[in-house]
Amino acid sequence: MSSPSPLPVEDPPGGRRAVAVWSIGVAVYFVAVIFRTSLGVAGLDAADRFHVNASALSAFSLLQLLVYAGMQIPVGLMVDRLGTKKVLTLGAVLFTAGQLGFALSPSYGMALAARALLGCGDAMTFISVLRLGTRWFPARRAPLMAQLAGLVGMAGNLVSTLVLAPVLHGAGWVAAFAGSAVAGLVVLVPLVLFLRDHPEGYGPPPREREQVREHGKGAGAGGGFVRRQITASWREPGTRLGLWVHFTTQFPAMVFLLLWGMPFLVEAQGLSRTTAGGLLTLVVASNMALGLVYGQLVGRRQSARLPLALGTVGLTASLWAAVLVHPGDRAPMWLLVTLCLVLGTCGPASMIGFDFARPANPAERQGTASGITNMGGFLATMTTLLAVGVLLDATGDNYRIAFSTVFVLEALGVSRILRLRGRALARERELRAPAPVPAGSAVAAEPARAATG
């Protein structure tokens, strides 16, 4: 017998209040992304300030992302158990403290600790925003709301490039990072005063609330709840497919924007910082433009999910290969521009991972399933950030060899996607099949059999 459909019986209505509450959540996420990506425009400055080489520099982003990825499942469990508001509030406090600490750190070790704290707070934002979208808007809007959240996140990246970089180079390190930390305090006010987990009358169903209460009783009950949530989510092939889609699509752009894009464009391609910053901005602008397109396509046609994801991977690999094997020391500007435009597809494609995990899990597991999925891209990003730094040190700053690690992880991810897609799609069709008709209904029995095949 198949499991009951995880889709809610009655969708929340959406509307203006939903938009207002959701906007508070994405504002917190927006600030978190500014803080997360601020090192991307300050990589060379950080190397000078703390007197570190490429491997040590990559450790900043690596540690931040290690904490972020490691927190995804715990955060998903926290969202499922405590609700969105509490988790978002804690996250905002932590990432604000981390950004301020990074501004004032006098040593490399203290700066690393500050980035870890920032990563911990940052980890609590995106899954919470996804949960707000599913609690406040109809299910048919879920792909679009997820893409909109990703778009707002990329806008935060844009602020890092267009606003923080000039302030950093004009006013200095402390003014740029400490000044930006004020934004964290600003978003805390509406978060604490006005954000609600769900609309009135659309809270968790009684069965879900009872399960949470029961799981919280008795010694070791918390551990049992954690195991049940993780095991049940991971058992669904849609969750695993979502993780690998996220893993394979997101990391090429993340590596470029978070740390290695600016050094690659300046040191390997001979561009000025201004021109390199413009190309980083182009990645973000492309992402924002394409996010809505991907969201509309997936929302209207679920069958477009895998072609979009795999097509994005193929296009990204092709452009990176063209840049890295181009004859001569430097690729032409038109090719670098094309690469940056294509890297803008990585973020929207990574959101497709959540569109596989979401229908595979009931409401009470959405946070956990989203956390598992969201680990994928950040694990790939961490691996590539470290590999590029190590290879740059080992090869005397040979960016062609260092960036070839992109192809290894893309090949791994594609192989896993192809292996899981059949089982995930079959399970999704099973969950969406009509519920069995009661045995006494002879008239309705035949249509029910026809519908289920």
Located regions from the model:
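Helix-to-loop junctions at the C-terminal end of transmembrane segments
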Residues: 71-83, 290-304
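Cytoplasmic membrane-interface "Motif A"-like loop-to-helix N-cap segments
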Residues: 81-91, 299-314
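Cytoplasmic helix-loop-helix junction between adjacent transmembrane helices
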Residues: 114-153
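Helix-loop-helix hairpin linking two adjacent transmembrane segments in secondary transporters
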Residues: 148-202
